[in-house]
Amino acid sequence: IMFERPSNGRKTASPGWYNTASFEQFANEEGVYAKTINGDAFSKEIKNLTIETIKKDLGKVDLVVYSLAAPRRTTPDGVTYRSVLKTTGEEFTNKNLNLKDNSIGMKSIPAATEEEVEATVKVMGGEDWKLWMQALKDADVLSEDASTVAYSYIGSELTYPIYFEGTIGAAKKHLHQTADEITKEVGVKALISVNKGLVTQASAAIPIVPLYMS
């Protein structure tokens, strides 16, 4: 599942659209199943479409990888929350790599309000992950020994103020808590994979972190 902009005839598609289309093409050429659903993974409509696709093409699945980086999320009750990339406690200043002109300068990150932290947890935390797993479980499209994994990152102390101790860190902590809830309440083994830092479209948007990763 992706949420990417296709070409409209006047503008090219987003990079992610081409990457995913190429992956699907190469997989099919090798005889490996791959199908892309383009839409808002937070929405009930995409969840339902995914369930129907699994039923039609695969029957059941034994692994679900949950990896979403998004600026906003509309919850089932219709409320839209927006995530922020800020520190918590007090303002944080450090060197930053500006990818627009490849220059290095100082960057100050303001401290988030309590409401901004809560909103970021709503978007980037584990609530939607749990909704996904419950929906898949209820639809009987998970194999008996199915498991699910979500990704997290800790990083070095240099990145703590903006990541581990920042708003996105609060969301990742919620993700860890949700893994236990999914395992106990949904009945699906849920794991968190803590990985190294990678330069991606999502990670490049985090202030200060790109300089550390480079």
List the predicted regions and their residue ranges.
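Catalytic loop of short-chain dehydrogenase/reductase
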Residues: N8-T12, K86-V188, V194-S214
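Conserved beta-strand segments of alpha/beta enzyme cores
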Residues: Y33-K35, K189-L191
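"Short basic amphipathic alpha-helical interaction patches in structured regions
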Residues: A13-P15, I51, G78-S83
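A glycine-rich helix->loop->beta "capping" turn
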Residues: V32, L49-G78
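Glycine-rich phosphate-binding loop and adjoining beta1-alpha1-beta2 segment
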Residues: M2-Y33
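Conserved NAD(P)H cofactor-binding loop of Rossmann-fold oxidoreductase domains
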Residues: G39-A41, Y66-Y81, T87-S108
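Short loop/turn segments at strand-loop or loop-helix junctions that form parts
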Residues: M2-P6, V65-P71, A150-I154
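The beta1-alpha1 cofactor-binding region of Rossmann-like NAD(H)/NADP(H)-dependent oxidoreductases
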Residues: G39-T50, G126
